[in-house]
Amino acid sequence: MFANADIVISAWDGARLVGVSRALTDYSYCCYLSDLAVDVAYQKHGIGQELIRRTQSIIGEEVSLILMSAPGAMAYYPKIGFALADNAYVIRRKR
């Protein structure tokens, strides 16, 4: 999973992993944020937003950042600057 990622960023509290983001990108047009996970005990402290900010810092302003949200996180992303896309299609995975 991580071996094929272009960008992996982690957040730690001492020796405890509390957050991780994983992205795939061409570094010129788009970056797909495939995973964003923060330990429930550490949510609502800006960790997810910081993981995204660091991803954006790596890809730069000229690269679009896109993602597929988990249903429970749909309300989160607009709060941190994402816009709902009305021009996207998906072929869902079979498993």
Task: Report the location of each language-model feature.
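Short loop segments at secondary-structure junctions
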Residues: G14-A15, A41-Y42, R93-R95
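A conserved beta-strand-loop-helix scaffold within acyl/acetyltransferase catalytic domains
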Residues: M1-L36
